[in-house]
Amino acid sequence: VKQTPNSQDKLIVLRDRDMSRPLPTRPFRKLKYHKITIETPETPETRRMAENLYRYNEFITQHCIAFDLPDSALVTIAKAMAGNEDKYKLKHIDFSMVQLRRIFSRGDMSLHGRFYGGWWQSINSKDWEYRTHITIDGHRTCEVDYSSVCLRIVYALKGISIDPEEDLYDIGLPGKYSRSKRDLVKEHINAIMNDEEETFSLEKVQLRQLGLTHEELQTLVLKRHKPIREELIAGIGLKTQFIDSQIAEDIMLTMVDKGILVLPVHDSFIVKDKHQRLLETVMLESFKKYTGHPGSLDTTLPRLPCHFGYSKEHYKNLFD
């Protein structure tokens, strides 16, 4: 049954924090507060945003987004989702949830602004391999991700170009550099960018895995990113997310103009695998358009090429 898009007046949401109602958090976690929805200002810009999103939501109703997974895998995902303590996260997969909204934060239309509401976004990044089983109109998909997008945006705001091949999460850790250690550095950096109160710390078991104290890790991060040190500790995260939401809107509408559906997962996009190369081109162009500097991408292949061990270049060449 084809859905009717949500009315435009419900698509742009502005939230703020109720500072009198802090949420309970574990020690050394970022402080959180109850969120309240406030009135979205009626301006030409918010009307434009709503019109653009309504157009995307109307387009997505013409397509079928599904999971090509056995029931046992769906049960595993459902159990993981049911245990999520965040009340703003889905507790189960509802395949009818394909209508998106843009949510802004801190009562400011220039902070945050990412797209939410699609069921595919509820698949935790730790379970990313399940997203390789998402299909669009029965076709296999791939996911193209911006690499270290928020850090690259901060550098761009300072007018500094970064080599697309440079790993911004490599901070010179002692010992062998591994994917698991890189993920912890990424978690730390992304957290401090959204932690104005400077209360965040990785858990003790995570710090032991890195072989560092919180202070030693922070010192390495700030030394590695000395040109943007002040921005990192000032909690610039919501500002960078607004810029990446502008980039996302541009990508979504560009692909709609081409008759191609992309599914946003904040700073990555899912598309039919035959459109991978086109999406990569559009993503790099949009990043340059909004930042003035080159971006960097990472692509997750569909499950079949992964199974046969194809390299990304080999897989791309299958379509040439």
Provide a role label for each language-model segment.
Residues 165-176, 266, 293-304:
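A generic structural motif
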Residues 117-235:
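Helical catalytic core of nucleic-acid polymerases
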Residues 230-247:
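Adenine-nucleotide phosphate-binding core of ATP-dependent small-molecule kinases
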Residues 196-201, 276-320:
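C-terminal polymerase-core module
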Residues 145-146, 189, 261-272:
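Catalytic palm active-site di-aspartate
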Residues 150-156, 273-282:
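A short acidic (Asp/Glu
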Residues 246-265:
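Active-site palm subdomain of RNA-directed nucleic acid polymerases
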Residues 1-130, 139, 296-320:
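Non-catalytic nucleic-acid-binding interfaces of large nucleic-acid enzymes and RNP effectors
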